[in-house]
Design a protein with these regions (language model features):
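NAD(P)-dependent Rossmann-like dehydrogenase/reductase catalytic/cofactor-binding core
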Residues: 190-239
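N-terminal Rossmann-like NAD(P) cofactor-binding subdomain of oxidoreductases
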Residues: 1-101, 206, 229-230, 237-238
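Structured loop/turn residues at secondary-structure junctions
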Residues: 54, 111, 152, 218-219
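Alpha-helical elements of the RecA-like P-loop NTPase motor core of helicases
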Residues: 5-6, 60, 117, 158, ...
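A generic structural signal for alpha-helix starts
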Residues: 2, 57, 155, 221-222
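C-terminal substrate-binding/catalytic lobe of Rossmann-fold NAD(P)-dependent oxidoreductases
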Residues: 71-74, 79-211
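Glycine- and other small-residue-rich loops at beta-strand/loop junctions that grip anionic moieties
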Residues: 22, 51-52, 108, 149, ...
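Generic alpha-helical structural context detector
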Residues: 64, 121, 165, 229-232
Length: 239
């Protein structure tokens, strides 16, 4: 994969005008852009940009709103993620980690994710405050990100949901759905992520509030749609 500025330079050398990497960049200098969250940092002079990952896109708007409205002290995210093409169809020796060699369609497989680190490039004010993990599950598409955060303010679940409903009821890049959906319902959705208010939960003890918020996403199509929005904006400012 051409997932660093150094390797992506080959595309520019071959005649491409711009490069948008469809994965987290493996260097510290390439900007990471999620449309609707920080796409306005793009400049016409930028030549190589990362769109992050599907999981980064699913949670970026959620993280930014929580931080802007209530302040995030720290947090942990888990993506319950559809299996991907990098996994095994059948058990067999391929990867150094034994778990990664197990058949994807019949196992829940703990996996790493770079989304928590990448989110710090998209929302710099939370850089270093989040950690993350993935569970690859037995579905071919349709994923969900659970974000647990300790907030700076005391807040209720209703207040969190109201903030998300106001912000995202009518945006193309991030959605809001209170219909009690499941993972198959999200397949074909064009948003980078869809907030599910029915799963919001809050626990406040001695003035400290911990909140659980959830975002569904089509990890294939939804991510692609949001990446295309970034690409179109990139092209527009580069004309």
């Amino acid at each position: 994969f051409y997932t660093s500025a150094e390797k992506s330079q080959a595309h520019l050398n071959a005649g491409a005008k711009k490069v948008l990497i469809s994965a987290p960049a493996k260097d510290e200098t390439t900007p990471t852009v999620v449309f609707g969250v920080n796409h306005e940092i793009l400049k016409a002079s930028d030549n190589i940009v990362s769109a992050g990952s599907c999981t980064t896109n699913s949670m970026a708007a959620m993280v930014k709103l929580l931080n802007d409205k209530f302040g995030i002290k720290l947090g942990f995210m888990t993506t319950i993620h559809a299996y991907t093409g990098t996994q095994m169809i059948l058990d067999g020796p391929r990867f150094p980690k034994a778990r990664n060699n197990r058949a994807a369609a019949i196992n829940t497989i703990p996996h790493s994710t770079g989304a928590a680190k990448a989110i710090g490039k998209v929302v710099p004010s939370v850089n270093g405050k989040l950690q993350g993990h993935a569970q690859r599950i037995q579905v071919p598409d349709g994923s969900v990100t659970e974000l647990t955060t300790v907030l700076n303010k005391e807040v209720t679940a209703d207040e969190i949901n109201a903030a998300f409903k106001e912000a995202f009821s009518n945006t193309e890049y991030y959605g809001y759905n209170e219909d009690g959906i499941v993972s198959s319902d999200i397949i074909g959705d064009t948003h980078g992520g869809v907030f599910d208010p029915t799963q919001t939960d809050v626990n406040t003890v001695d003035g400290t509030t911990m909140a659980r918020t959830v975002s569904f996403y089509d990890n294939e199509y939804g991510f692609t749609c949001n990446m295309i929005r970034t690409l179109l904006y990139f092209a527009e400012i580069s004309e």
